Regions:
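Alpha-helix-loop-beta-strand connector modules within alpha/beta enzyme cores
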Residues: 158-170, 221-229, 301-307
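Anionic-ligand binding region
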Residues: 206-238
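Non-cysteine beta-strand/loop elements that form the S-adenosyl-L-methionine
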Residues: 188-203, 274-281
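Auxiliary Fe-S-binding modules of radical SAM enzymes
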Residues: 1-63, 231-320
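Structural detector of well-ordered beta-strand residues that form the stable sheet scaffold
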Residues: 172-174, 195, 246, 276
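Conserved Radical SAM active-site core
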Residues: 63, 67-189, 193, 203
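Short glycine-enriched, charge-decorated loop/helix-capping segments at active-site entrances
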Residues: 113-119, 208-213, 290-298
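Conserved radical SAM core fold
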Residues: 115, 152, 177-180, 198-216, ...
Length: 320
């Protein structure tokens, strides 16, 4: 059995100076720009183009495209999540906000009851604002928007109300990275921490496993824009994330070469990129020995060690 390589040094914190933290969206709120952005975002729902699928349906009239979401966002759950990255969960948890439905079609999705079957409750902007404020009252370190790409207008609506109610937590955009340029433009100056989960670099793999051949092009373009907006991840003196980019990547069986391509892209973006190489893949949803035999197994230790070797060889050093 191969000996595991030495793990990279602990993530190097780009530590923010002392003083009170102010989330980015407060400046937009004071100028009135946050409400204007929310109104502009809602206009995108008339012929929906929130994500690269650009379905063109009128969601304001409850027409449904790929994400099968109409005017209101549906919330599956919201709670203080202690299982996220340590820089997000801290001691009191990350204020996770799980939205129902999704704009992708991952055949291996482990949350298909939420993403495909739509488990959740349609919620108004006012109700979502109350949820955000409750998470703040419970002591959560941030508001963590999980699978948000198809409900950006609804998030902005709710955020504008929550800020008026006293919300002061950093905003985490926890996305599959399948976002449109228009959505990201509206989020510039709103989001503090972008956390894209970059899945595939090869269009053929994206088509087979996500039902989105254009995913790699759209995702890498989105990640580059996210980095332009917020830069490398910065933490406070307690190690809590305050601003910047944190990238997730799910290591999958037999697809090490694709992982290497993604890591190479991220190193080209910045060698200070904070990365979490996820190893919890397991066959789920539509994956079986008959349907997708090539990914019908867990990731091996050898595959993970090889991914770490490549990570180090690129000069990357911030590994969660």
């Amino acid at each position: 059995m191969r000996r595991p390589p030495r793990r990279p040094a602990p993530p190097r914190s780009l530590t923010l100076p002392g003083g009170d933290f102010e989330p980015a969206y407060l400046a937009l709120h004071r100028s009135g720009e946050l409400r204007r952005r929310a109104a502009e975002a809602l206009d995108l729902l008339k012929a929906c183009r929130l994500c690269p699928r650009a379905c063109g349906v009128d969601r304001l009239r409850e027409a449904a495209g790929v994400c099968r979401t109409g005017r209101l966002a549906a919330v599956s759950s919201f709670f203080g999540h202690r299982g996220e990255e340590s820089c997000l969960s801290g001691r009191r948890g990350s204020g996770a906000f799980f939205f129902s439905r999704c704009n992708l079609g991952c055949v291996f999705c482990q949350n298909c009851r939420i993403s495909r079957m739509g488990e959740g409750v349609p919620s108004s902007a006012g109700q979502m604002a109350e949820m955000m404020l409750r998470l703040q009252e419970e002591g959560c370190h941030n508001i963590n928007l999980v699978t948000p790409s198809h409900v950006v207008p609804q998030i902005l609506e709710a955020l504008a109300l929550a800020v008026e109610g006293g919300l002061r937590l950093p905003l985490v955009y926890n996305t599959s990275a399948y976002d449109s340029a228009e959505s990201l433009r509206l989020l510039d100056g709103v989001v503090d921490i972008y956390m894209p989960d970059v899945k595939f670099r090869d269009p053929a793999l994206a088509e087979r496993y996500l039902r989105a051949r254009d995913y790699p092009e759209a995702a890498l373009r989105s990640v580059a824009e996210m980095h332009r907006q917020v830069g490398d991840l910065e933490t406070d003196r307690q190690g809590l994330a305050r601003r910047g980019l944190l990238v997730r990547h799910l290591l999958m069986p037999g697809l090490l070469e694709d992982t290497k391509k993604i890591l190479s892209f991220l190193a080209g973006l910045s060698r200070d990129t904070w990365i979490n190489i996820l190893t919890q893949y397991r066959p789920a949803n539509q994956v079986s020995a008959l349907t997708f035999p090539e990914i019908n197994r867990p990731v091996s230790r050898e595959e993970y060690y090889a991914a770490l070797d490549h990570f180090k060889s690129l000069g990357l050093h911030r590994l969660d």
